[in-house]
Amino acid sequence: MSVFHDEVEIEDFEFDEEKDVYHYPCPCGDRFEIPREMLEMGEDVAQCPSCSLLIRVIYDPEDFVKLETISTSKPIAEPV
């Protein structure tokens, strides 16, 4: 069981589009981070790369559902 420094809503994070990572300030001076891919997988723990602190990210997993496209081997026939 992890001990969290805090619980923070995803809306309070900053999103780095270039790195596809959410950031939130850490008391040590660095930033907690969690990649969008981890949120899509249901992960809710952001770590600081400089210290041992963890925070729990509060978010709606449905907002991060990765939509998959399904390809069909047959072309779809148009109605005549």
From Swiss-Prot:
Pathway: Protein modification; peptidyl-diphthamide biosynthesis. It comes from Caenorhabditis elegans. Keywords: Iron, Metal-binding, Oxidoreductase. Component of the 2-(3-amino-3-carboxypropyl)histidine synthase complex composed of dph-1, dph-2, dph-3 and a NADH-dependent reductase. SUPFAM superfamilies: CSL zinc finger. Residues 4-60 form the DPH-type MB domain. One of its GO terms (molecular function) is iron chaperone activity. This is Diphthamide biosynthesis protein 3. The keyword Transcription regulation does not apply. Belongs to the DPH3 family. The DPH-type metal-binding (MB) domain can also bind zinc. However, iron is the physiological binding partner as zinc binding impairs the protein electron donor function. GO terms for biological process: protein histidyl modification to diphthamide; tRNA wobble base 5-methoxycarbonylmethyl-2-thiouridinylation. Its cofactor is Fe(2+). Required for the first step of diphthamide biosynthesis, a post-translational modification of histidine which occurs in elongation factor 2. Dph-1 and dph-2 transfer a 3-amino-3-carboxypropyl (ACP) group from S-adenosyl-L-methionine (SAM) to a histidine residue, the reaction is assisted by a reduction system comprising dph-3 and a NADH-dependent reductase. Acts as an electron donor to reduce the Fe-S cluster in dph1-dph2 keeping the [4Fe-4S] clusters in the active and reduced state. Fe cation binds at residues 26, 28, 48, 51. It comes from the Eukaryota. GO terms for cellular component: nucleus. It catalyses: [3Fe-4S](1+)-[protein] + Fe(2+)-[Dph3] = [3Fe-4S](0)-[protein] + Fe(3+)-[Dph3]; 2 [3Fe-4S](0)-[protein] + 2 Fe(2+)-[Dph3] + NADH = 2 [4Fe-4S](1+)-[protein] + 2 [Dph3] + NAD(+) + H(+).
